[in-house]
């Protein structure tokens, strides 16, 4: 094949990614398949091939920051042992291709089954730094990594670069890139003694909170989000990794309310399994140095270094459904109809969502619901009455609690969730770790909810 024809093939592959041989031959002025095959061989590793037989497609390899080599994808198992499970490559003009070294445990729709993705593979995208911890990381490392200090502005290429360079401790069980995996090995080498004894927790937590506020987003609570840090603990002899949220240190009305909400989140995590038989993340409340700390056990971490897979509804929805958020039960029904979500877990999603509605949780975005492979519902988390969170500037909202009655089809689920919400509001009203003012609100809400439930029986 002439040099010009090679350039023509490169041009067509750039313009028409994931084209099959029939399409490529047609776009190259009707050349035959033998000529195409020779041309593809000439381009060598510059061409990515995925799929078998009639599903075979071709794309032109795109470098990531000047490096066109595939990036290894590793998995860490529950015992802390790692292995390579695939290789990630980037394609022109955008998107990625993933080779699978073993069975992929997450749903794959359409071309994803052959390894083609419009952006990053959704389980990799789910690892991206975000929220308070992500912003703290970006503020600290943006200059070194050549990315914006706002992770919301990162492109897929930025995310891949950051993960492949530094992402050894992201949510779930995956690590992207050899450099990040070597960081994990360093972590294993020096991190076995990281677990805090009970006697060390107070000092460590107070220092971690101070560090988070000094180096992080000091306006987080004002913006409707708890500041937080990660830690490793010995709890009754058990090694656990935790995410710890904390309140401010003064006695202002806004800080008291944030403290109240942390206790409410802990009580909601107790209510879900007790009243609805829905698993929730283990949690505990601590009071140190004028701050309230909510310690939430990570369900994707096990023992010294073990990990397990997890993916949020946000990434699953974007990749498989594309509804862009909305009510969890609606998205769950769509996953159920596609055969990815069981009837049992779809029903549990509806229960969790209605419970959230009836405890005034106005922050049930798709990032606050997660799944394990299968898709099996992961323990619930971030469930609290966010309608009562202080507004930006610290003013407390004066909101009337007006719970929604259900449509007939939702009535059985609603009643179960309503009974659980009455229980929740009552235990909040009785918990002296919550301020007297907010306990009165909780008591009033329990009465309103009980009255509505009685009318709906």
Functional labels for PLM-detected ranges:
Residues 1-8, 14-23, 27-457:
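Phosphate/dinucleotide-binding and metal-coordinating scaffold of catalytic cores
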């Amino acid at each position: 094949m002439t040099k010009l024809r090679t350039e023509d093939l490169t041009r067509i592959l750039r313009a028409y990614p994931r084209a099959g041989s029939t399409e490529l031959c047609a776009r190259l002025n009707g050349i035959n398949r033998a000529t195409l095959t020779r041309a593809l061989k000439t381009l060598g590793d510059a061409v990515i091939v995925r799929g078998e037989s009639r599903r075979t497609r071709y794309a032109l390899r795109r470098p990531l920051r000047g490096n066109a080599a595939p990036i290894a994808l590793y998995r860490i198992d529950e015992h802390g042992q790692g292995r390579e499970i695939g290789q990630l490559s980037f394609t022109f003009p955008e998107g990625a291709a993933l080779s699978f070294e073993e069975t992929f445990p997450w749903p794959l729709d359409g071309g994803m089954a052959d390894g083609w993705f419009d952006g990053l593979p959704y389980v990799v995208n789910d690892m991206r730094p975000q929220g308070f911890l992500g912003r703290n990381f970006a503020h600290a490392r943006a200059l070194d990594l050549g990315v914006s200090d706002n992770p919301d502005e990162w492109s897929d290429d930025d995310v891949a670069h950051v993960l492949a360079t530094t992402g050894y401790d992201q949510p779930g069980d995956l690590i992207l890139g050899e450099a990040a995996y070597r960081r994990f090995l360093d972590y294993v080498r020096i991190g076995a003694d990281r677990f805090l004894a009970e006697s060390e927790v107070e000092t460590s937590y107070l220092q971690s909170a101070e560090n988070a506020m000094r180096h992080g987003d000091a306006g987080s609570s004002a913006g409707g989000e708890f500041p937080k840090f990660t830690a490793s603990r010995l709890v009754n002899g058990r090694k656990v990794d935790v995410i710890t949220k904390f309140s401010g240190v003064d006695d202002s009305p806004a800080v008291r309310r944030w403290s109240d909400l942390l206790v409410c989140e802990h009580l909601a995590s107790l209510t879900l399994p007790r009243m609805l038989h829905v698993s929730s993340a283990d949690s505990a409340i601590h009071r140190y140095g004028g701050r309230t700390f909510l310690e939430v056990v990570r369900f994707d971490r096990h023992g010294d270094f073990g990990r397990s897979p997890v993916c949020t509804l946000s990434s699953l929805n974007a990749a498989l459904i594309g509804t862009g958020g909305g009510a969890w039960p609606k998205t769950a029904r769509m996953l159920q109809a596609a055969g990815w979500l069981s009837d049992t877990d779809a029903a549990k999603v509806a229960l969790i969502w209605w419970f959230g509605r009836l405890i005034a949780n106005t922050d049930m975005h798709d990032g606050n619901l997660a799944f394990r492979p299968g898709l099996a519902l992961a323990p619930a988390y971030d469930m609290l009455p966010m309608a009562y969170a202080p507004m930006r500037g610290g003013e407390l909202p004066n909101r009337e609690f007006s719970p929604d009655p259900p449509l007939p089809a939702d009535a059985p689920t609603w009643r179960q969730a309503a009974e659980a919400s009455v229980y929740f509001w009552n235990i909040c009203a009785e918990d002296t770790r919550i301020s007297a003012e907010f306990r009165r609100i909780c008591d009033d809400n329990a009465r309103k909810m009980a009255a509505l439930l009685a009318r709906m029986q």
